[in-house]
Structures are given as structure tokens and as C-alpha cells.
Amino acid sequence: GNYQAESFTSTNLADLWRANVFGSINSSYPLWRGQPAPLTPERAYRYSPVAIVPGLSLNSNVNTLLAAYGDGNQQNTISLSGGPTLTLGNFSKPFLDYTQLSVTGGGTLKQGASPFDFDQAVDLGTLGVGITQQIAGPLLISAGVALNVDPASEFYGDVINSNIEVRWQRRSYDFGFYYNPYEGIGGF
């Protein structure tokens, strides 16, 4: 597509076409697996369309982005991220029966640079932490934060993303409100 956006190297607008290809592969390796609640609509499927199983798993993701721009520049990245996810509870009881905690670290190799400010790959080392907690019934609260942990980056130690979400989740639908303090946006 053709884009008009702020240039990465100046305050001027750049007007260039941009084409990209993205690929991603996820994997999960269970280290410990508990038992689900009885597989009935009143228990395991009370608030969720799938049975929540307590456990500990290692998750990983490999993705690549190949981007070409109208001025001849290219930006190519390959990223690897992973970490543990701990799930406690079955999300079938009325109070505090589901907690999920995730920690994810990641690194990115980059070749070239984007002429645009909005898609410049600058966070090449990241650390993220997220938690989801059942409060009462189908009411969940989630929060997450990601940091730049690349010591060679001028943004080292900066928050690169954050979110807070309150969600009402039932077996066949969910409704939520989120707010992203980093971006200053929210929605339903």
C-alpha cells in the first residue's frame, strides 16, 4: 500500500509505498498438567467455551517480517520469544478460581531500516509480564506490561507496551473494557 507518515530521520512526512510479508509459528510444551473440572456446562464450561486446565507450560514464538519500501529501503526482522505460563484453578467456582501468570522474554535480529517512524524496529530485546485473575463469577481482570531490556538501545528500561482489561466472560460471549496507558487508548 501507499503510506504517508512521519519519517524516522526527520519531522517531514514521507510518501512511499510499503509491502510486507509476515510469518509466525507458536509452540507450547506442557511441563505440568492438572485435572480439569468435570466436563459439564455447570462446571468446566460454566464461564469458558473450553475447559481450563491448571498447569505450567513453556511457550515459544518465532516470527519474521520482510518489508520493502518505495525508496529502495528494506527492513527484515526475525524474532524469537518464549517463557513460562502458570495456570491455577479451573474457572468454574464463583470466586478466585482462575489465575494465569505469564513471563515472556524475546530478542530480535534486524537487517536494514524502515524510512517510517511508525514501523521502525527499535525494541530488539524485550521482557513482558502478564496476569489474569478471576474476581467473581465471570468477571476477570487482566494486566500486562512489556519493557525494553536491550542494553544497547537508547530506550533501555522503557515501558514499550502496557494494558489493563476488565472482562465479563461467559461460555458463548465475552464483553470487556481495556485501557492501554502506554498508548493512551481504550475501548470496548
What are the functions of these language-model segments?
Residues 1-188:
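Outer-membrane beta-barrel proteins and related beta-barrel translocases across Gram-negative bacteria
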